[in-house]
């Protein structure tokens, strides 16, 4: 069991993958400790710090100072903020910057940012010189509890989200809870959707705890650290069992089949929809669709929607600004989902709170009819 170990100033959650195991450190002040922690694990490295313009303005100087104190030379590579940086063009830009800096295979790529920066940086680290070291320093709640853990990396294409990438586990994850204080309320809410997801997958006790304590999670302190640690613990356990998503790791995609389709439909325009908002709507739809298919009671869907609404997250197609294309177009995006096998649809559905399961061969006609109904309500 990947039980978190508590220290005076941080929590450590191990990810057990044999000789590729690594630690997730969670706590305050980890930006300042980053140089020390990296130096313990990666001797004599130089690093490329990949970050976006917004994060760089707030955290880059402190991180570079931390590396300098540890005797680690760092080269910043700054990209534009937002989902559109998960592109072939930005991939080429970052790759070229690392090669121009003459970083070697034994050096490290450090991702300082949210899920976009982490996904992009991990892909770069996996392909430059056929594989460099990789350190995740997630600065959003979403990245701290989800995308920084487990080794999924990649970019988007015109055909859909995350369709080009590699599995590339980091050597270390440093989740500084203090940096979350700089997030906008919208960004924090979006990350919270992934926290709630872990309770909805297979931990009804955790979901009930979130229903009772979400305000404390938002305000910070011990409840926030607990929510992050428990989320990481849940994901680490799944990744240890199924690193390459050949089995139950697919459960972590609860809400993502619908959510990714909505992100694609909005052109990855973060002014309209960010990933966590898509996941929130996607989870609500997954519970509604499960009820429609007589797999779960409507009470579970209503409870999920009530909690997500309480924290300020969207739960319906009507809440996507700018409207959506017809159901047939949404189905085209769903058909590009990575869980599609030989043309058949796979969804993560549910029998109730904390009772999610992998549903194979879901009838496309049923999904299409469901989407038409939900769009009509919108």
Curated annotation (Swiss-Prot):
> Pfam families in the record, alphabetically?
DHQ_synthase (PF01761), DHQS_C (PF24621)
GO CC entries: cytoplasm
> Which major enzyme category is it?
lyase
- Cofactor comment text: Binds 1 divalent metal cation per subunit. Can use either Co(2+) or Zn(2+).
Cofactor(s) required for function per UniProt = Co(2+); Zn(2+); NAD(+)
Q: Which domain of life is it from?
A: Bacteria
Q: Which GO terms describe its molecular function?
A: 3-dehydroquinate synthase activity; metal ion binding; nucleotide binding
Chief location: cytoplasm
Q: Which UniProt keywords apply?
A: Amino-acid biosynthesis, Aromatic amino acid biosynthesis, Cobalt, Cytoplasm, Lyase, Metal-binding, NAD, Nucleotide-binding, Zinc
A Gene Ontology annotation in the biological process aspect, one of them, is:
aromatic amino acid family biosynthetic process
**Pathway involvement?**
Metabolic intermediate biosynthesis; chorismate biosynthesis; chorismate from D-erythrose 4-phosphate and phosphoenolpyruvate: step 2/7
Q: Which InterPro entries match?
A: Dehydroquinate_synthase (IPR050071), DHQ_synth_AroB (IPR016037), DHQ_synth_fam (IPR030963), DHQS/DOIS_N (IPR030960), DHQS_C (IPR056179)
Residues at which NAD(+) binds:
115-119, 139-140, 152, 161
- EC numbers listed for it are 4.2.3.4
Stated family = Belongs to the sugar phosphate cyclases superfamily. Dehydroquinate synthase family.
What function is annotated for this protein? Catalyzes the conversion of 3-deoxy-D-arabino-heptulosonate 7-phosphate (DAHP) to dehydroquinate (DHQ).
Protein's name according to its UniProt entry: 3-dehydroquinate synthase
Give me the gene this protein comes from. aroB
